Amino acid sequence: MKISAFLFTLLVAAAFLAGACSTQGGGTQQGVGKIRNESESVDPKNAQSVRAQLKMGAGELNLTGGADQLMEADFSYNVAEWKPEVSYDVSGDEGELVVEQGGSGGSNLTGEARNEWEVRLNDELPTDLVVQLGAGESDLDLDSLALAGLKLQMGAGKTTVDLTGDYAQSFNASIQGGVGEATVELPSGVGVKAKAQGGLGRINAEGLERVGDSYVNDAYGESDVTLNVKVQGGVGEINLKVV
């Protein structure tokens, strides 16, 4: 994905602020170069569950299930400093996976930047997922994952989250809005209870009934599994939709 002028401006502003807050940090010039295509695969080893963190500063993230390993990913980028950093450790029977965009604060980009991640996670391992997004577009298809928890922090751009899976266990999902638009698709066959707190933006609820300070779907209180969603609005728009 080519980063739009608007998102590019936000990215440069964020980088400038990060540099200003760093300790005596001077800016460095980052040029746009040739496209680099890289693949990563992570073996779960003996982990019985995993905490996975994805931290992307700018670009396009497509996250799905279907990996035979713990994670299988393809990365394309043309700013050398943005090379993704992947780490994985196992403590006891729990794995800790971190995928983070490289690069330091206080940098100035020149040229047309490109950064695309295609990440696939394992469907069988219970996964506590943390996604931190900056500027760009993200498509998170999480319906096949064995989610144990979700924390999503959005930046500037457009994000779609698919939580329509037939989940085997209840879990909490926390969604923090940013600047832009987010659509969260929710299941009809699994109980959903959503609490939304405002910001400067707008929160829309489709297919959900207002009960007190919460929104619930028709399956709430009837199914063995409940998806508890906490939404903190930002400057943009968040759409909750039962499908």
Positions of PLM-derived features:
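Bacterial N-terminal signal peptides that target proteins for export
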Residues: 1-8
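C-terminal motif of bacterial Sec signal peptides marking the signal peptidase cleavage site
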Residues: 17-20
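Bacterial signal peptide processing site
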Residues: 22-24
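Post-signal-peptide N-terminal segment of Sec-exported extracytoplasmic proteins
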Residues: 34, 43-65
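Short, surface-exposed interaction patches in beta-rich subdomains
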Residues: 36-45, 73-110, 158-243
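N-terminal beta-strand/beta-hairpin edge segment
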Residues: 58-59, 67-80, 117
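Extended Gly/Ser/Thr-rich low-complexity repeat segments
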Residues: 106-122
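Extended beta-solenoid/beta-helix repeat architectures
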Residues: 122-126, 132-135, 142-149, 153-156, ...
